[in-house]
Amino acid sequence: MEIVAAAQDVGGETAAGKWYDAANATFTTLVDAKHAVSSAFQFVNVPTGVWIDERGRVVRPGEPAWTSSRTDNFGGKALVIEGAEYVAALRDWVENGERSRYALSDAEFARRVKPRSPTEMEAEASFKLAVWFQQAGKPTLAGKYFERAQQLNPDDWNYHRQEWSFSGDTEAGQKWLEKFQKLDAPYYPKIQMDPASPQPK
């Protein structure tokens, strides 16, 4: 098994590298300044993980990837984290490979991962333009497209988080809390770890 982490921030290593240094990471670490990973795997929040086998097949789509379970409280609103279940399933897959109860069939994978809607595709294109303008030193134009992406797909927390990062940690935290407290749905979707049918030998 190999763990690969991808920190996604238009600020590149300057913005994201310090977190790897602080963690003394012993696994492969990448800095994704263009958010290519989120785009490819439809990530909308962090931490999110995908399982990819030795053949390059994606075994499970993006899911909240915590390592322990707990319930946090922010402004009187609960944030439930399901880490223990995720790690247990991951260990089963590492041990059993394609025979794991948690390795999804192609049909089940397709059922869980839907193509982006036209609105979501426009949001993604707007976000990519924002990233390009930000890295080209044109923050005003970047801000216009960051805002457009967030309006089109308000459920994508990565869009919000990246734009908020330019406000400083304190203001970004306040914006996150305001949006979090207005949520009608869970911040992290419940992990669908119901075991899939074993693959035939």
Label for each model-derived stretch:
Residues N24-T28, F41-V50:
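Structural micro-motif
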Residues D53-K138:
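Thiol-/selenol-based redox modules, centered on thioredoxin-like
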Residues E120, L152-P154:
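Short coil turns that delineate tetratricopeptide repeat
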Residues F127-K128, H160-E163:
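Alpha-solenoid helical repeat scaffolds
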Residues M1-A22, A33, V37:
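Structural microenvironment flanking redox-active thiols in thiol-disulfide oxidoreductases
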